[in-house]
Amino acid sequence: MTQDEQICSLALTRIPGLGLTGAFRLVSSLGSATRVFEHRKELSQLVPGVSEKIITALNNSEAFRRAEQELTFCEKNHIRCLTLNDEGYPSRLRECDDAPLALFYRGNADLNTLHIINIVGTRHATPYGQDICTRFLADLSALYPDTLIVSGLAYGIDIHAHRAALQNHFKTIGVLAHGLDRIYPAEHRKTAVSMLEQGGLLTEFTSGTNPDRQNFVKRNRIVAGICLLY
């Protein structure tokens, strides 16, 4: 995927008034984020319903400056920026109307492997719940050892699922509600570091984004969207 497409995808996410579904619609209609900017003057003819206000907003130079800044951060920190047209982008998630235009990824797991399951649950996991999770993954490892385990690195069942996955030699992905410049909760850093060697960390949020409450709701659609079973 070209750097231009990465920059244009990141810039689109920062266009005032466009929103995620609006940006996804433009990229889907024209085939790429780059083409959205190349054809911005005639967007109202190419994509019905696009307002002049949005067309004017696409000239936002600050959006491009921030996009270039973020891509520099990614390059320095060995983070992959996966756009919708990137072959590494989760194909199941791409089918969703609210799919992120770009994902930030550190790790070595194939996000399009055949078997991907989601294990999530309460943040106040009981010993019984933890035991069920552990036994399930132990049994699964004998049947489908190449399964990718996805969760949210949160307290409770999430972190237990990641740790049980690592113990059973699964690759496991943590979908984060913040940028890749931090780990939240901080107590899970050791597990997160292990996951970078046996799975990875994934987010739609740029560096500097805090783990605010609304971001956890947004990230849940990614946890669900990349999985075959959940």
Model-identified regions with their sequence ranges:
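Short, positively charged patches
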Residues: 1-145
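Glycine-biased, small-residue-rich flexible motifs in mid-sequence functional cores and linkers
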Residues: 2-3, 83-230
